[in-house]
């Protein structure tokens, strides 16, 4: 059981539908909208020929808290000079990127980088970074389900702090930077 008592449950994505023929020959997805080419295709876990809440599985054993959080630092001195560095990060963490407003805000504005990387009729890329974009939340319902399609690796390490200083007899001058990389 995860430390925070939470596991991520959702559908297992099998890519994007590339044609109406593929949709017609796949298990029926009963997720509140008409499925179209470019929509996310989900696995029929229980084999009943339809995709519904009974086909959800634990898609990440990690909850909202990373399993490992770490930091490492060093302070060096040489004559009147000093240098301090600190790195921190987390590991064993999965994030779900489905809520990054890929489908627009309440005004339905879509960021250009999303539109450029989405599945479109004029560019039917089966490996598109984003599924087909619809006009309304109801039109996007199939693609807004929590699934492995939206899972991302949440591990990171960052260069948190750098400080370089020089000490005088009665004081110290230093430069400090935070969140450098």
Question: Model-predicted segments: where are they?
Answer:
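Repeated loop/turn-to-beta-strand initiation elements of outer-membrane beta-barrel proteins
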Residues: 80-84, 171-172
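A generic beta-sheet turn/junction motif
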Residues: 76-80, 89, 168
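Extracytoplasmic gating/loop element in the C-terminal half of outer-membrane beta-barrel translocons
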Residues: 2-27, 33-37, 90-178
């Amino acid at each position: 059981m995860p430390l925070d008592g939470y596991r991520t449950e959702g559908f297992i994505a099998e890519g994007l539908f590339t044609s109406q023929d593929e949709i017609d020959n796949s298990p029926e997805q009963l997720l509140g909208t008409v499925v179209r080419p470019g929509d996310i295709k989900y696995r029929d876990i229980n084999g009943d020929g339809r995709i519904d809440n009974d086909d959800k599985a634990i898609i990440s054993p990690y909850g909202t808290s990373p399993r490992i959080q770490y930091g490492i630092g060093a302070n060096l001195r040489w004559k009147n000079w000093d240098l301090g560095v600190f790195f921190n990060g987390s590991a064993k963490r999965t994030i779900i990127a489905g809520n990054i407003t890929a489908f627009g805000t309440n005004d339905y504005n879509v960021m250009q980088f999303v539109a450029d990387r989405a599945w479109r009729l004029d560019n039917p890329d089966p490996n598109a970074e984003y599924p087909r974009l619809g006009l309304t939340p109801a039109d996007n319902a199939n693609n807004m389900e929590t699934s492995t399609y939206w899972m991302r690796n949440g591990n990171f390490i960052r260069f948190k702090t750098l400080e370089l200083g020089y000490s005088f007899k009665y004081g110290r001058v230093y430069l400090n930077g935070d969140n450098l990389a």
